[in-house]
């Protein structure tokens, strides 16, 4: 017997690109019954928490310590982002920071100072939970030693309100790769979940060949995706490319957040990977700093150039009710 | 009988000895040496012919570098004192950007060179 599910009432994950980052809302149906309810119950048993509504923000690529022509304002955009997140009408429960928290330097003392400055600014966030992964500028020169000293492990997982979050490190081996050891850990980590479990992977580099000659790839990304693809509700959030991007590969959706320092151009249009020049009249334009309307689900953002609204809705996968993200065009 | 066998074996060895150096020289690929040093390659452009096998000899002058070019399936690393060799027979024409994909410092993102493959 085919089960009937109200696709829009199942679970909604909406993402609004703030420019300063991305705000997501996970909205599982409060009264989910039948197969969906059973799945939620199962998730509740696995994670100790049944999926319930919450919101979180993705921030990326602050490059604390960078101060050059593409952005002579240093940490101003990062600090502005913190203010904006704190001003959101609905307080997010979680921040995911997808790498390049700091800009690299070979002077260890200076890099340590940059790590401290990152922590000082990020602690101003009025958000109970902040989770990070490193970028190559944090961890590429020392195999992630200093990153781990300040921020802990670079790959790990945790559960939040029934959603399984996985932090993947694809920078600490200096090459753009996850590596066999971490892939084995990932496979084991995922094994306890049903195939319909909602999973959010956050990492620094794209896990697919977005633009390999700009180093926008992960060399063993296909092997990672082979581990993730049996799961029907996987979202991958990443940074590194300093611009919005949305890709759907199979049933997995990949989203990049903008940076907090400078933007890179569209690789399909620009001949070279050169930062978008700084505009002193509009210092945050290329970072897309935007104000968020109180009701971001139905109202447009102010001064926005590109808004993403992503919904997780119910979908049947091989007879199992799962979730799928749908990317909506901006409603401006 | 034993003497004939030894003589035959000697002739075979002699034939191989005489033939091999010429044959090896005739089929040895062209060697192109590329030096990697933060944050560039020297030379920064080489031109190859489609179907011609070449040997790229990579030498690092400072730290570990990568040498990555997805379309031609090149993914190599080179460390100081340990040159790397790549046998390459390009199967397609075009202009390709090869990058260092082993993070090597602040301007790592700009470390690249061009490989042109012509007919």
Feature-to-residue mapping (PLM):
Chain A
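Active-site neighborhood of phospho(di)ester-bond hydrolases with catalytic His/Asp-centered motifs
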Residues: 59-60, 95-99, 130-136, 202-203, ...
């Amino acid at each position: 017997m085919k089960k009937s599910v109200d696709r829009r009432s199942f679970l909604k994950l909406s993402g609004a690109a703030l420019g300063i980052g991305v705000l997501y809302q996970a909205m599982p149906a409060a009264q989910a019954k039948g197969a969906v309810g059973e799945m939620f119950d199962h998730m509740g048993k696995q994670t100790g928490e049944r999926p319930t509504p919450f919101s979180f923000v993705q921030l990326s690529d602050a490059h604390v310590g960078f101060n050059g022509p593409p952005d002579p304002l240093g940490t101003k955009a990062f600090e502005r982002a913190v203010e904006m997140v704190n001003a959101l009408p609905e307080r997010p429960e979680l921040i995911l920071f997808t790498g390049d928290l700091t800009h690299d330097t070979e002077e260890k003392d200076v890099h340590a100072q940059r790590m401290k400055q990152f922590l000082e600014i990020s602690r101003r966030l009025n958000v109970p939970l902040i989770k990070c992964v490193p970028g190559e500028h944090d961890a590429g020169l020392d195999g992630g030693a200093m990153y781990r000293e300040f921020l802990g492990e670079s790959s790990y997982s945790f559960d939040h309100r029934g959603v399984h979050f996985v932090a993947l490190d694809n920078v600490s081996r200096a090459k753009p790769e996850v590596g066999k050891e971490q892939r084995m850990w990932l496979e084991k980590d995922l094994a306890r979940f049903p195939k319909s479990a909602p999973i959010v992977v956050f990492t620094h580099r794209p896990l697919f060949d977005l633009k390999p000659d700009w180093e926008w790839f992960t060399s063993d990304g296909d092997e990672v995706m082979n581990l993730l693809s049996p799961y029907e509700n996987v979202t991958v959030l990443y940074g590194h490319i300093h611009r919005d991007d949305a890709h759907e590969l199979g049933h997995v959706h990949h989203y990049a957040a903008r940076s907090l320092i400078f933007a890179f151009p569209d690789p399909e249009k620009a001949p070279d990977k050169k930062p978008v020049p700084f505009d002193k009249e509009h210092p945050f334009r290329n970072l897309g700093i935007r104000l968020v309307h109180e009701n971001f689900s139905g109202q447009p953002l102010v001064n926005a150039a590109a808004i993403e609204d992503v919904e997780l809705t119910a979908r049947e996968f091989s007879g199992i009710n799962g979730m799928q993200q749908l990317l909506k065009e901006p409603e401006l | 009988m034993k003497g004939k066998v030894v003589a035959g074996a000697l002739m075979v060895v002699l034939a191989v000895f005489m033939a091999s150096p010429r044959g090896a020289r005739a089929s040895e690929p062209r060697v192109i040496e590329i030096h990697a040093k933060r944050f560039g390659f020297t030379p920064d452009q080489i031109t190859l012919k489609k179907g011609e096998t070449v040997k790229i000899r990579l030498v690092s002058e400072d730290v570990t570098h990568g040498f990555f070019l997805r379309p031609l399936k090149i993914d190599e690393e080179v460390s100081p004192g340990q040159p790397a060799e790549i046998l390459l027979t390009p199967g397609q024409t075009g202009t390709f950007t090869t990058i260092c994909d082993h993070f090597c410092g602040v301007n790592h993102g700009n470390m690249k060179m061009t490989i042109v493959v012509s007919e």
